[in-house]
Swiss-Prot record:
It comes from Gallus gallus. Glycans are attached at residue 483. Residues 654-669 have a biased composition (Basic residues). GO terms for cellular component: endoplasmic reticulum membrane. Involved in the maturation of specific proteins in the endoplasmic reticulum. May be required for maturation and transport of active lipoprotein lipase (LPL) through the secretory pathway. InterPro entries: LMF. It is found in: Endoplasmic reticulum membrane. It is a multi-pass membrane protein. This is Lipase maturation factor 2. Keywords: Endoplasmic reticulum, Glycoprotein, Membrane, Transmembrane, Transmembrane helix. GO terms for biological process: protein maturation.
Length: 714
């Protein structure tokens, strides 16, 4: 029945720890400017004392920050403490395998959920929800290593809980592909979305400029490939043929790497690759590590009937995938022009009819795949040696299989949002279960890049400050486009959340972004924490010595320059055109500004006094001072370099040294027949005793775990 996914599981847990590290550190470096008492959206507004008991407060807003006052901390300091503890714990889990424990991942998940509850608009991104859901699954997937009385190399039910990660990946990718068509966006239906995407995404990379120069026919073909990878290929996640699953894995990795190269999407794409590790198996991971196991007789000829049928089905799947792509996107090579033509060959009505027809069958496909994993795990439990350990394994299987089925059932509600008719056919009890856990972000709906914005030019808000209303100076951000001569930044896995919200603000009227008035107000006040969100380097902020008296915001349209536009002067990455005023000229005390602040409850109130002699606030302040001189993305890169260097040095230390064989053993002695027989009997006896103590493996498990334990005892 196959091996439990021990190595893929460890890779998933390590990758998730790396994503948590990016999330905690990135947010920590932005807390004062975003959520501090002098920040844009002070977090204390969310947690208002109302006279309720602690449990009632936790029920309404589940966050550990309610406990802050008992530690002498306000809401901002509580957020900093959670981020620091989360960063330390995630770094430990990344570097040390024994720390990848279900209890530690439960703590990380509670920490991030606590931050999410007060994060307001700056934490309302799909990757934050994805991290919370993946973090909850990690609690089920990770072993309990707190007790060392039994080996935790693998558990018979590991493949059951790990299947939920695959199901999450399927929901993420399939929904992301489907919503592009259900949104009726003309660019996605016309296959021209990528001709706009590279220059209109929030924070492009320098590689995006070069990708934007690619010919239109290639951009359209890239959209077709995106549809195939996001809609068709995810169906292979549940195929019984492992080579099809590996093909699906590498397709997903290719797509995510290309997105990473051309856009700054923080930890999102890396986290998606981490989820894709659920498609791997022990054999393939062993080949990655140079420890592949040879299957005797695997190269025998002629092949067995099962192997032949498997290969035939695999080839048929590839052929069907190719036919589906050519037929439904009218792929045709124009030999005279030397290009590949493509267009959508189906209508919106036909697509919605197809989606309605396949949504519930896809649920059935997922249920069948999960049922197979559950039965396979039960078989492995039956193969465990020793009555007590067999009973213990079966009890664990029952608990985790029930939890997995429950998670699968709850996830059907957000998954079927892609077709509301199918959503209405779900059992009412499933909707009730989902409503009960919805505020805990256990499962979520997904669907990225639903509509392509910026058609006709990328809208961009440019802030300008002045002392006299006559001469205006632009305020340039660290990351988002502004100066047309400045190259696009590379900041991932850091997410500059203010820059992202500036991108959303430019898509509508400023009244749709209430935080913007507070942002302008803080700049007029010269609040250092908010200024650091714009520029860490004071020399690059034009009003570092004295705050501006007046501020206004202009709306521009930005476009990437073309390669033919490069001249003899300084290279320009962008060209822009003024559109209109985005935010009127205001100053401190301006009635317009005060009215906007009062309308959204953002007017300054007398904050609570902080204790000055408490140890914990002093410690948090000291740590904050250490991070101030550095840019956030540099801090994150440095932490990852430290982690990578540590892992590399550890791997080099574990690698066996080459060179001449040791001289103390002249030659391996050949045991006499009777002595060799006694040694063999002794080894078999030790193996049986180990299995009876719980060290035993299922009969269907791979060889290789037991001998390691024997070597340690020797």
């Amino acid at each position: 029945m196959g091996e439990p996914p021990r190595r893929p599981r460890e890779l998933f847990l390590a990758g998730l720890a790396a994503a948590y590290l990016a999330a905690f550190v990135s947010l920590y470096l932005q807390i004062p400017g975003l959520y501090g008492r002098d920040g844009i959206l002070p977090a204390r507004r969310v947690l208002r004392l109302s006279g309720k008991g602690l449990w009632e407060q936790l029920r309404d807003v589940p966050t550990l920050l309610w406990l802050g006052p008992q530690l002498g901390l306000d809401t901002e300091q509580g957020m900093e403490l959670l981020c620091l503890l989360g960063a330390v714990a995630s770094m430990g889990a990344l570097l040390c395998a024994p720390l990848r424990d279900c209890l530690l991942f439960a703590v990380l998940r509670v920490f991030y959920l606590s931050l999410y509850q007060v994060g307001q608009v700056f934490l309302y991104f799909q990757w934050d929800s994805l991290l919370l859901e993946a973090g909850f699954l990690a609690v089920l997937v990770a072993p309990l290593r707190l007790f060392k009385w039994r080996s935790t190399a693998w558990r018979p039910h590991d493949s059951v809980t790990f299947w939920l990660v695959r199901w999450l990946l399927f929901r993420l990718m399939f929904a992301s592909g489907v919503v592009k068509l259900t949104s009726r966006c003309p660019t996605w239906w016309g296959l021209t979305a990528l001709t706009y995407h590279y220059e209109t995404q929030c924070i492009p990379t320098p590689a995006a400029w070069y990708a934007h120069q690619l010919p239109v026919w290639f951009q359209k073909f890239s959209v077709v490939a995106t549809y195939v990878i996001e809609i068709a290929v995810p169906l292979l996640f549940f195929m019984p043929i492992r080579r099809l699953r590996l093909f699906a894995f590498y397709c997903q990795v290719l797509l995510q790497i290309l997105i990473i190269l051309t856009g700054n999407y923080n930890f999102f794409n890396a986290l998606t690759i981490v989820l894709a590790f659920s498609l791997l198996d022990e054999e393939h991971m062993g080949r990655w590590m140079g420890r592949g196991k040879r299957k005797h007789g695997s190269s025998a000829w002629p092949p067995t009937l099962l192997s032949f049928l498997s290969t035939l089905l695999e080839l048929a799947t590839y052929a069907l995938l190719l036919y589906w792509s050519v037929h439904y996107f009218s792929l045709e090579i124009d030999w005279e022009k030397g290009l590949l033509e493509s267009k959508v060959a189906f209508t919106y009505h036909e697509f919605t009819q197809w989606l309605r027809a396949v949504t519930l069958p896809l649920v059935g496909l997922g249920f069948l795949s999960l049922s197979w994993e559950i039965l396979s795990a039960l078989y492995r439990c039956a193969c465990v040696r020793g009555f007590f350990w067999k009973l213990w394994a079966t009890l664990q299987w029952a608990v985790f299989a029930t939890a997995t089925v429950g998670m699968f059932a709850i996830s059907l509600v957000p998954f079927t949002y892609i077709d509301y008719e199918s959503n209405g056919k779900l059992w009412p009890g499933i909707h009730q279960m989902f409503s009960a856990v919805e505020r805990f972000q256990v499962v979520n709906s997904y669907g990225l890049f639903r509509r392509m914005t910026g058609v006709g030019g990328r809208p961009e808000v440019v802030l300008e400050g002045s002392y006299d209303k006559q001469s205006w100076t632009e305020i340039e951000f660290m990351y988002k486009p502004g100066n047309v001569s400045a190259a696009p930044a590379v900041v991932a896995p850091h997410q500059p959340r203010l820059d992202w919200q500036m991108w959303f603000a430019a898509l509508a009227h400023h009244s749709s972004s209430p935080w913007f008035a507070s942002f302008v107000h803080r700049l007029l006040q010269g609040k250092e924490d908010v200024i650091r969100l714009v520029q860490v380097d004071e020399d690059k902020y034009p009003f570092s010595t004295q705050p501006p008296v007046y501020l206004r915001a202009q709306l521009y349209k930005y476009w990437f320059t073309h390669s033919a536009e490069s001249g003899a002067g300084a290279a320009q990455w962008w060209r822009r055109q003024h559109v209109q005023e985005f935010f009127p000229t205001v100053s401190v005390g301006d009635p317009t500004l005060d009215g906007l602040l009062a309308q959204h409850g953002l007017k300054d109130k007398l904050p609570l006094k902080r204790p000055v002699d408490a140890f914990l606030p002093w410690l948090l302040s000291s740590v904050r001072q250490l991070s101030r001189p550095f840019s956030p993305h540099v801090v994150l890169w440095s932490l990852y370099v430290v982690a990578a260097t540590t892992c590399l040095l550890r791997a080099m230390a574990r690698r066996p040294r080459g060179g001449a064989p040791p001289t103390r053993h002249k030659a391996p002695k050949q045991p006499r027949g009777d002595q060799g027989e006694k040694n063999g009997q002794l080894r078999r006896k030790e193996g049986r005793e180990a299995e009876e103590r719980g060290e035993g493996r299922s009969r269907g498990a791979a060889d290789g775990e037991g001998p390691r334990g024997t070597k340690r005892r020797k």
